[in-house]
Amino acid sequence: MTSLEPRLTWGALPDSLRTLGRWITIVQVVGYTTSLAFVWHTTRLTPVGVEGQYRGTDPGATEAAMQFPKSLTQMLTLTHTHLLGMAVIFVLSGLGLALCSWPSDRWKRLLIAEPFVTLLVSFSAMWLMRYLDPRFSWLLVASSSLLALTFYLHSFLVLRELAR
């Protein structure tokens, strides 16, 4: 795109679409933060806690304790719902970021692609940790942390742009 071509940015959109973008972002931040609170509550965001969540800590644990080994059906359900749901979250936040006037297009492309790659790494690590080696819990914690940081950066940049 040359510098003479018009750019589609939040500033060029009607107020109604800016309001929609603002509220979608706010609700996503609340929802994502709530999900992180749940993860903290169930795993303490540690590799040992994550391992216990998926591999189980006690073979006799009840489902109410949520620290039992996840079955193949549970792993498939968890992966299916979370992967598709999180992809939608990052489509929306990526669209919002694409409409921002800053950062540069190169950085925007990197920030838009990053969560999709990290989602695949996170869910691969979850499966590898569950069925192959518990040490993959470190990769799951690291990739999920990067995913959260990227989400909050997307949200900050979009809300900053919409506050102008």
Where are these regions (language model features)?
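Transmembrane alpha-helical segments in integral membrane proteins
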Residues: 83-101
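Membrane-helix interface segments
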Residues: 103-107
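Extracellular/periplasmic helix-loop-helix junctions in multi-pass membrane proteins
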Residues: 128-140
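Polytopic transmembrane helical bundles with strong interfacial aromatic enrichment
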Residues: 2-67, 72-74, 96-99, 110-118, ...
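A loop-to-helix transmembrane entry motif
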Residues: 70-88
